[in-house]
Amino acid sequence: MQIIHEDPKEGKVKVKAETLDDLWHLYHIIDEGDVVYAKTLRKQSQRSDSLRAEKVEVIPVFLGVRAEKINFHKFANQVRVTGPIVYASREDVPLGKYHTIAIEEGTVVTIQKPRWKEHHIERLREAVSASKRARVMIVVIDDGEADMALVREYGVEILTSIRHNLGGKRYNTDREAEEKRFFHDVAKTMEEIMNREKVEKAIVAGPGFVKEDFYKFLRENYPELVKKVVIEDTSVTGRTGIYEVIKRGTVDRVYHENRVAKEVQLIEKVLENIAKNNGLVAYGLREVEEAANYGAVETLLVLDELLKGEMREKIEELMDAVRYSRGEVVIVSSEHEGGEKLKALGGLAALLRFRVK
């Protein structure tokens, strides 16, 4: 994300969305009641006289829309903001009519808020910082099968699976030839994805020796690619293996600032403390509020969905209270496994400095 201009007096920030991750951040920055300004296309009815049929044309126009609905369409790569028009650059566009602004990669948009809250500012800074960071690719590989995923700012995106039938015995000549074809297929797919997505690092993981064989193959055949590869063990393959890599902290070690890795590990710490029954965790609104009142919250985990729901004001007050007592607030994406686990706990959890019971 690129910040183009800030106008604190008017409560306006003009930004350019550069990636899919930026769209995810904007979805959480824009609230109901905000005014969103952008260049857009609008259908306009034209009639030259009463005898002629009404003609509809699409016109380019700069609009300001007061947000009533904000939707993130991951597969269309869009954030859609719908609401009444409050500003139009053309006089023939009536104010008060409803319009949807589609924010895509490359869209320049101005957001105006009555008040920019701390979590909005934090997310904006994070989006700008994230745009300078490389994302991480995970490849879980075993006999004739490889699953690839991209760790994005909003969660884990499963990209593709590659399957080759390698046949029987491990040292059979035909098998070795097919394995080489499989390795070439995986390597070329990795290169294509890493170039397209501008990924600087790939974690190659798996339960057996195949990952080491693949690494050796890369060293001999893809010397530039192998420089970007880190090897890791997993106990399983497939999607479960991908999440195991994240839980082990490998993504964090490879790129220590990665948001998803941090969120998943914090949720695992919460679950670990619950299992230990050590009193150093609270979850659910009542328990977390009580811990915050004592100043006991070291890290507050908030599911992003709560900041779009009816409890938003109450949650924001809780976040402010935790920050006041020098606790850390982490907004957890609902788009990954850790977010699903937090949702099962009511969407709120806290790691505590000391026991309150």
From Swiss-Prot:
Cite the SUPFAM superfamilies for this sequence.
Dom34/Pelota N-terminal domain-like, L30e-like, Translational machinery components
EC no. given is 3.1.-.-
Provide the Gene Ontology terms for cellular component: cytoplasm
- Cofactor needs: a divalent metal cation
Query: Per its record, how is this protein called by name?
Result: Protein pelota homolog
State a single Pfam family of this protein. eRF1_3
Q: Which domain of life is it from?
A: Archaea
Question: What is written about domains in the entry's comments?
Answer: The N-terminal domain has the RNA-binding Sm fold. It harbors the endoribonuclease activity.
Compartment list: Cytoplasm
Q: Can you tell me which family this protein belongs to?
A: Belongs to the eukaryotic release factor 1 family. Pelota subfamily.
- Role according to the record: May function in recognizing stalled ribosomes, interact with stem-loop structures in stalled mRNA molecules, and effect endonucleolytic cleavage of the mRNA. May play a role in the release non-functional ribosomes and degradation of damaged mRNAs. Has endoribonuclease activity.
Q: Which leading EC class covers this enzyme?
A: hydrolase
Q: Which GO terms describe its biological process?
A: nonfunctional rRNA decay; nuclear-transcribed mRNA catabolic process, no-go decay; nuclear-transcribed mRNA catabolic process, non-stop decay; ribosome disassembly; RNA surveillance
Name the InterPro entries for this protein: eFR1_2_sf, eRF1_1_Pelota, eRF1_2, eRF1_3, Pelota/DOM34_N, Pelota_arc, Ribosomal_eL30-like_sf, Transl-rel_pelota
How is the subunit organization of this protein annotated in UniProt?
Answer: Monomer.
Q: Which organism is it from?
A: Thermococcus onnurineus (strain NA1)
**Which of UniProt's keywords are assigned here?**
Cytoplasm, Endonuclease, Hydrolase, Metal-binding, Nuclease
Q: What is a GO molecular function of this protein? A: endonuclease activity
